[in-house]
From Swiss-Prot:
One of its GO terms (molecular function) is structural constituent of ribosome. This is Large ribosomal subunit protein bL32. Pfam families: Ribosomal_L32p. It comes from Nitrobacter hamburgensis (strain DSM 10229 / NCIMB 13809 / X14). One of its GO terms (cellular component) is large ribosomal subunit. PANTHER family: 50S RIBOSOMAL PROTEIN L32, LARGE RIBOSOMAL SUBUNIT PROTEIN BL32. GO terms for biological process: translation. Residues 1-61 are annotated as: Disordered.
Length: 61
């Protein structure tokens, strides 16, 4: 069975775990509606994506 040759140092362990951190999702303000939305996602309220109408806008009821 394979065994580690040396003990993993705290520095190396920390560098390995640095990619596991959870970051807050970023938001961009929509130019038309002023609402916050995720970058590279369509705005569900207006149905727009990159200036094009992709979905029908949600009707207010």
């Amino acid at each position: 069975m394979a065994v580690p040759r040396r003990k993993t140092s705290p520095s190396r362990r920390g560098m390995r775990r640095s990619a596991d951190a959870i970051s807050k999702p970023t938001y961009a303000e929509d130019k038309d509606s002023g609402e916050l939305r995720r970058p590279h996602h369509l705005d569900l309220k207006t149905g727009m994506y990159k200036g094009r109408q992709v979905l029908k806008a949600k009707s207010e009821s």
